């Protein structure tokens, strides 16, 4: 595994002149961010040794490098999901490669169904914490000390300073933001009404099929993380909607400009560690 990470990182480094310290995983709701990047390099996943390839509609597969406002960033266009059949090592492989390349801060986004009755479709939720309900764990198996500790501390999975900064940006621009706990499940089925009730009762506010494995590996590697969900459907008791992938994409597209604005401002304003 270490050899594969190094191989991928060396290939990417050979193609990129000025390696950034900040990376963004362009999940649902953030695809438009790429239009704000002054692109200097683009590398398709298919060209990178050992890299998996995304199979999901709406997730194209390439690494993009360039300037977002005043900051150099790496953007991952197209992520890998456990439900696609990848094992956890492959789902999180790009995050390992990011760390090898010197990335210190990771920004992630996703689409989520909300169980919290105060949330509305189109809301943006800052992820303050998560509940991991995936059936496998990205750190299961042999631990390599050079990648991170055997038993990582998860008391602050999402950076409090970045959360505070994002809330300030929203307040200054009169943008409605909610915050809450993201429940990560394997998918690919959307949730049943009973599952929504269960997730809410155990402390979840929104649920989705990504993000948690990447965040675990990023924190294991010592990266600072900020995450945001766009609420694309409701699983509130008595209001469970009939949801489809198309509906999710439609709701995400509507919320995209606001999420893009917040992420762009946040990435430009935060101090790199």
Predicted regions, residues:
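His/Asp/Glu-rich mid-to-C-terminal helical/loop segments that flank catalytic regions of hydrolases
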Residues: 236-273
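Short acidic/polar active-site loop segments enriched in Thr and Asp
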Residues: 104-105, 205, 224
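Active-site/ligand-binding-proximal alpha/beta "capping" segment
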Residues: 169-205
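Generic non-transmembrane alpha-helical segments
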Residues: 11, 15, 161, 165-176, ...
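Metal-dependent peptidase/peptidase-like ectodomains
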Residues: 143-182
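Zn-dependent metallopeptidase/amidohydrolase metal-coordination segment
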Residues: 209-247
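Metabolite-binding pocket within alpha/beta catalytic cores that recognizes anionic/polar moieties
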Residues: 1-154
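Non-catalytic positions within long, well-ordered alpha-helices that form the structural scaffold/packing
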Residues: 99-102, 200, 219
């Amino acid at each position: 595994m270490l050899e594969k990470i190094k191989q991928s990182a060396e290939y990417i480094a050979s193609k990129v002149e000025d390696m950034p310290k900040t990376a963004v995983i362009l999940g649902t709701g953030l695809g438009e961010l790429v239009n704000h990047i002054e692109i200097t390099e683009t590398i398709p996943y298919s060209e990178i040794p050992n890299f998996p390839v995304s199979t999901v509609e709406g997730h194209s597969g390439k690494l993009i490098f360039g300037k977002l406002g005043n900051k150099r960033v790496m953007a991952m266009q197209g992520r890998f999901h456990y439900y696609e059949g990848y094992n956890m090592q492959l789902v999180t492989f790009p995050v390992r490669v990011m760390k090898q390349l010197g990335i210190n801060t990771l920004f992630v986004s996703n689409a989520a169904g909300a169980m919290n009755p105060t949330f509305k479709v189109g809301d943006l939720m800052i992820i303050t914490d998560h509940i991991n309900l995936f059936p496998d764990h990205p750190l299961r198996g042999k631990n390599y000390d050079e990648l991170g500790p055997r038993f990582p501390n998860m008391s602050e999975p999402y950076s409090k300073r970045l959360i505070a900064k994002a809330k300030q940006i929203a307040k200054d621009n009169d943008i409605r933001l909610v915050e809450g706990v993201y429940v990560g499940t394997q998918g690919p089925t959307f949730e049943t009404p009973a599952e929504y009730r269960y997730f809410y009762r155990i402390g979840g506010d929104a649920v989705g099929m990504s993000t948690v494995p990447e965040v675990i590996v990023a924190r294991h590697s010592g990266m600072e993380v900020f995450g945001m969900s766009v609420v694309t459907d409701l699983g509130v008791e008595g209001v469970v909607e009939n949801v489809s992938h198309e509906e999710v994409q439609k709701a995400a597209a509507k919320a995209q400009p606001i999420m893009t604005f917040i992420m762009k401002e946040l990435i430009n304003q935060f101090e790199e560690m």
